[in-house]
Swiss-Prot record:
It holds the Pfam family tRNA-synt_1c. Keywords: Aminoacyl-tRNA synthetase, ATP-binding, Cytoplasm, Ligase, Nucleotide-binding, Protein biosynthesis. GO terms for biological process: glutaminyl-tRNA aminoacylation; glutamyl-tRNA aminoacylation. GO terms for cellular component: cytosol. A motif ('HIGH' region) lies at residues 34-44. It comes from Photorhabdus laumondii subsp. laumondii (strain DSM 15139 / CIP 105565 / TT01) (Photorhabdus luminescens subsp. laumondii). This is Glutamine--tRNA ligase. Monomer. It is an enzyme of class 6 (ligase). Belongs to the class-I aminoacyl-tRNA synthetase family.
Length: 555
């Protein structure tokens, strides 16, 4: 089923259908408004797929707007990474990229309009006093002693704020609403604060910056957004969103709708916590394959299609819930099982010699995908010396062990049946070489005498093997909800990265960055985009062939 055929339905799409049917709107215009203060993560992918997906399905428009109202935390590095992530996920924004900073002059004029209407005032309480005066969920707030300044006085003070005549934290512009409101967001929220910091778009033009709640709704209205979609934590903020638009002179009145945010198990989404992982060098960086960032998932080997499918499967609801990591892993397994070419890699090699096989090599033809002949085949050399995985041999084993056992037979993938005859060990009793014989009449066919050989193992020709590093990534945390722990860093999974040195078949010698494979019997891997090269192959494990954590949780 294609993504187009699997068009989802949810409460937001039902609202849009009704709006179009009643003529409330004649078209659909959404937006994706990230703050450029970090890298996008899988939670943002849900919002991207929703906003851009809705616009695409209804032949509408979706803007990419950077909510760049805090110059202290923002950087052009994040702007560039966000643009790349959106495009990599398969979406294109409508028209030019927007920035909230594009509207700073207009926002300033709207702030003056509120002052002139007696609906905003300059407050000189300290940030700590503002918090104290705001009250709690059980206690109402109390009015600032500066709340009843005259309109003229507020206009003069606001202009002084803009001119840089106040230090940071010494003055701010607040909306005059209701300090006794049951909704704390409506207790005279701050609209502008002072920050002496260079802005990545505006330079040093401004030293006062509008707050998110003031900027967001006006930006939506200026852009003609019909459906402003955001996550549930902004539900109470909708009251302020509507209040601002109702009290300024503006024609367009967008409506905000909230949906549940994505909470994925075995990871954290908080920018503060993610930044701590990077700053403390627990991970390599924002694109570390263990991170839930889009760039991290991409480097690990996740495809854009698998992430879009994941967002489709989890759906859009009004109720927060935790999504199992297995749901995300299932999407990439399904994608790569269908589309990734097969190859052989030995991650923990032990030497195997086929003593009755002549010297030289034999070229075997192997399908790139067992169920897709259109993906073609590749030539793989076979010789009397090969590498197999150390876990695929035992000197003694029970009947459930379907691999190579001393004195017994097994089939080599797409090759011959071999029998283990003897082993050679080092001084520490470690096996260094397995000596075998082979049946030269069993190349891709059963033995003529009818004997049954059930096990199949993979291999790489020792003569032609290409050395490679394998980075076995796993879940970064040992508990499903690390963010709820007192010390989330104490729950780091010590096995989240295991590095192995082994070999791959020669067809992978020129593996391209981010190229994905199914390494037979091992899992899904991709060539690392940062460290892999022709001289030093590095493959990241994207996912195992099956969910090993399901068994762990049951034990």
């Amino acid at each position: 089923m294609s993504e187009a055929d699997a068009r989802p339905t949810n409460f937001i799409r039902q609202i849009i259908d009704e709006d179009l049917a009643t003529g409330k709107h004649t078209s659909v215009h959404t937006r994706f408004p990230p703050e450029p203060n970090g890298y996008l993560h899988i939670g943002h992918a849900k919002s991207i797929c929703l906003n851009f997906g809705v616009a695409k399905d209804y032949q509408g428009q979706c803007n990419l707007r950077f909510d760049d109202t805090n110059p202290v935390k923002e950087d052009v590095e994040y702007v560039d990474s966000i643009k790349n992530d959106v495009q990599w996920l398969g979406f294109e924004w409508s028209g030019d990229i927007r920035y909230s900073s594009n509207y700073f002059d207009t926002l300033y004029q709207y702030a003056i309009e509120l002052i002139n209407k007696g609906l905003a005032y300059v407050d000189q309480l300290s940030p700590e006093e503002i918090r104290e005066y705001r009250g709690t969920l059980k206690e109402p707030g109390k009015n600032s002693p500066y709340r009843d300044r005259t309109i003229e006085e507020n206009l003069v003070l606001f202009e002084k704020m803009r001119a840089g005549e106040f230090d940071e934290g010494k003055a701010c512009l607040r909306a005059k609403i209701d300090m006794a409101s049951p909704f704390i967001v409506m207790r005279d929220p701050v609209l502008y604060r002072i920050k002496f910091a260079e802005h990545h778009q505006c330079g040093n033009k401004w030293c006062i910056y509008p707050m998110y709640d003031f900027t967001h709704c006006i930006s939506d209205a200026l852009e003609g957004i019909t459906h402003s979609l955001c996550t549930l934590e902004f539900q109470d903020n909708r009251r302020l969103y509507d209040w601002v638009l109702e009290n300024i002179t503006i024609d367009c009145r967008p409506r905000q709708y909230e949906f549940s945010r994505l909470n994925l198990e075995y990871t954290v989404m908080s920018k503060r916590k993610l930044n701590l992982l990077v700053a403390d060098k627990i991970v390599e960086g924002w694109d570390d394959p263990r991170m839930p960032t889009i760039s991290g998932l991409r480097r690990r080997g996740y495809t854009a299609a698998s992430i879009r499918e994941f967002c489709r499967r989890i759906g859009v609801t009004k109720q927060d819930n935790n999504v199992e990591m297995a749901a995300l892993e299932s999407c990439i397994r399904d994608d790569l099982n269908e589309n990734a070419p097969r190859a052989m890699a030995v991650l923990d090699p032990v030497r195997l010699v086929i003593e009755n096989m002549p010297e030289g090599e034999q070229i075997l033809s192997m399908p790139n995908h067992p169920n897709k002949p259109e993906m073609g085949s590749r030539e793989v050399p076979f010789s009397r010396e090969i590498y197999i995985d150390r876990a695929d041999f035992r000197e003694e084993a029970n009947r459930q062990y379907k691999r190579l056992v001393l004195g017994k037979e097994v089939r080599l993938r797409n090759a011959y049946i071999i029998k283990a005859e003897r082993v050679e060990k080092d001084a520490d009793d470690n096996i260094t070489t397995i000596y075998c014989s082979y049946d030269d009449q069993t190349l891709n066919k059963d033995p003529a005498d009818g004997r049954k050989v059930k096990g199949v193992i993979h291999w790489v020709s020792a003569v032609h093997a290409v050395a490679a590093e394998f980075r076995l990534y796993d879940r970064l945390f040992c508990v499903p909800n690390p963010g709820a722990e007192d010390d989330f860093l104490a729950t780091i999974n010590p096995e989240s990265l295991v590095i192995r040195q082994g070999f791959v078949e020669p067809s992978l010698a020129d593996a391209k960055s981010e190229q994905t494979y199914q390494f037979e019997r091992e899992g899904y891997f991709c060539a690392d985009s940062c460290h892999s090269s022709a001289e030093n192959l590095v493959f990241n494990r994207t996912a195992g062939l099956r969910d090993t954590w399901a068994k762990i949780s049951q034990d």
